[in-house]
Design a protein with these regions (language model features):
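Repeat-blade elements of multi-bladed beta-propeller folds
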Residues: 1-22, 56-82, 123-152, 158, ...
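Extracytoplasmic/lumenal domain signature
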Residues: 9-11, 23-55, 87-124, 156-195, ...
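Short, surface-exposed beta-strand-loop junctions and turns on beta-sheet-rich folds
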Residues: 32, 80, 151-152, 232, ...
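Short acidic (Asp/Glu) and glycine-rich catalytic loops that position anionic groups and cofactors
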Residues: 149-150, 268, 303-304
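Glycine-rich, aromatic-lined ligand/substrate-binding cores of catalytic
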Residues: 195, 295-343
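N-terminal leader/propeptide and maturation segments of large enzyme subunits in energy/redox metabolism
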Residues: 262-291
Length: 343
């Protein structure tokens, strides 16, 4: 869904784009592949995803970013199992060589490994991928990657724990892939609450102090405002008690979820009988009321159940894809909002 422009030190112009599991580099002068890049003009996007990934689905739904002589990419992978890992990778934009990898599902001894109760979970889990795109602070050399959930989307009995670095904004040194900071927006996601857009960067004024900031919008209708240098919240982000009494075998949900104290949610946070379209027929209304009365809908983080759970806003809700546009002059952020209920 996009291309990445690159100009080498000789002022030659190229574009990168992905088709299937291949990242191509094309010479803009003649439209031909750059044969010196990777394998005669492309690199296999399975590279850097670990053992046994070659047969798994992987592509890119958003273009990569250029930093110096690197093309840095996220990926789109399966939302069920088996799924490839969502590692963030940087390739040499000239040769196609793999330069660095950040593992979004930590392995033994790596930070975040302890966020999975099963010590072998990393061997079989996939996902935690940055499908929505990446953001670069070129001046500071910081890459920001918004990740989605670990697969499966709606059951986490095989991945008990908070599941780092899924559902997180991850700040990386763009030159070497080393983590600078992270902030997790959903613990142990079983609601498909992937971060749906790249964060936007802007200077935010608070009490006459200018803060280099980052705004990350979510499917749930929240905006997380963070200092983009150190990842600290600009306003308090509270750990709110949420329903955690899952009846699914093996499932252990987080007892709290992070909720920004400011700004208020930009999407409605509940769907009641009164929200049914007033223009539907009486028969349709009765049918909808029957469905709503039979499913779980106590909270935006209601535990998934075998009988059904209301997800509102839905799997493609909040600010999915549309993203945000900052107005630093007026200290405002503009965003779209999708309000669609799913079961």
């Amino acid at each position: 869904r996009g291309i990445t422009y690159f100009e080498d030190k000789y002022q030659n112009s190229f574009i990168f784009y992905a088709v299937g599991s291949k990242l191509f580099k094309i010479n803009l002068k003649d439209g031909e592949p750059d044969l010196s890049f990777g394998n005669t003009g492309y690199v296999d996007l399975h590279i850097g995803l670990g053992e046994n990934s070659n047969s798994l689905f992987v592509t890119m739904t958003s273009p990569g970013v250029i930093y110096k002589n690197l093309i840095i990419v996220g990926s789109s992978v399966s939302e069920g199992n088996p799924a490839a890992k969502g590692n963030i990778r940087a390739f040499d934009a000239n040769s196609g060589d793999l330069i660095w990898v950040f593992k979004t599902i930590p392995e033994i001894g790596e930070e975040g490994y302890e966020s999975y109760d099963d010590s072998n979970a990393f061997r079989r889990l996939g996902g935690a991928n940055a499908w929505a795109g990446l953001t670069l602070d070129e001046e500071r050399g910081i890459l920001y990657a918004p990740t989605g959930s670990v697969s499966y989307d709606f059951y986490g009995g095989d991945r008990v724990g908070d599941n780092l670095f899924a559902n997180s904004i991850i700040a990386l040194d763009a030159l070497n892939g080393k983590k600078i900071w992270y902030f997790q927006t959903v613990h142990h996601d079983v609601w498909d609450r992937d971060l749906p857009t790249p964060p936007v960067l802007f200077d935010y004024k608070v009490n006459d102090t200018i803060i280099p900031s980052l705004a990350q919008v979510t499917k749930s209708g929240y905006i997380f405002l963070l200092n983009r240098i150190n990842g600290k919240p600009i306003y308090e982000i509270k750990e709110k008690d949420v329903p955690s009494n899952s009846k699914l075998v093996g499932e252990v949900l987080s007892k709290t979820q992070p909720i920004p104290s400011f700004p208020d949610a930009f999407s409605r946070q509940s769907f009641t009988d009164n929200d049914i379209n007033p223009f539907v027929s009486n028969n349709e209304r009765d049918s909808l009321l029957k469905v709503l009365s039979s499913i779980s809908k106590e909270d935006v983080f209601s535990p998934p159940t075998e009988k059904g759970t209301l997800i509102f806003t839905g799997f493609d809700g909040g600010a999915e894809w549309g993203g945000t546009a900052p107005d630093p002059v007026n200290n405002e952020v503009y965003r779209n909002s999708i309000e669609k209920a799913w079961i």
